[in-house]
Amino acid sequence: MGSQWLQGSIRHRRLYPVRHEFEYHTGMLALDTDEWNEVTNISPFFSLERFNWVSLKRKDYFRPEAGALSDAVREQVKEATGWRPDGAVELITHPRYAGYVFNPVSFYFCYRHGENGNNGDVPAVIMAQITNTPWNDRHVYCLETTGSEANSAGWRTEQFAFTKRFHVSPFNTMAQHYEWTFSFRGPELRIHMNVVEEGKKHFDATLVVHRGPLTRN
């Protein structure tokens, strides 16, 4: 099975106008979207399209009316970049827990043929699906990577800066822009996101996780 489990921590920091931060342990699913119909077979407590302790529902993700998630993402990436992913499409997300889901952002890592996250490969395109609260609207950003070389510590880093095009939170204005950094080293993944307005960082979030096998344990 190509799907994996990510274990680590996430930190949120609001830096302006009042400083506040928190950090907590987290686990996330790294789902090979071509395994959508099989991944829940690992446990009787993991279900597809029905209530369970852990579950996946197609309506929680990109264009549920379009059929298979993997095909919908590939077509969107082709429309945005001109390249249709010919390798794995890996969804980084929180599944539903006891029927409840909260994913401010889910990432679709789109790999070249023969590459995948299990090997620490850098995706050719990262598609981010933003879901706002409390309106539950969605927007996607397609980010093309550059094929960066590893630094002396073995990290391969991709950086993006772009204008905010979607209202996410009543606490953040549309005058802001994003600075995102993705770092890859073998089974390790780091994602850092800055929210900047008028040259001042208002908020950041950092995800640090390690890949492991997806098992019933």
Residue positions per predicted region:
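Mature, function-bearing regions of proteins
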Residues: 1-217
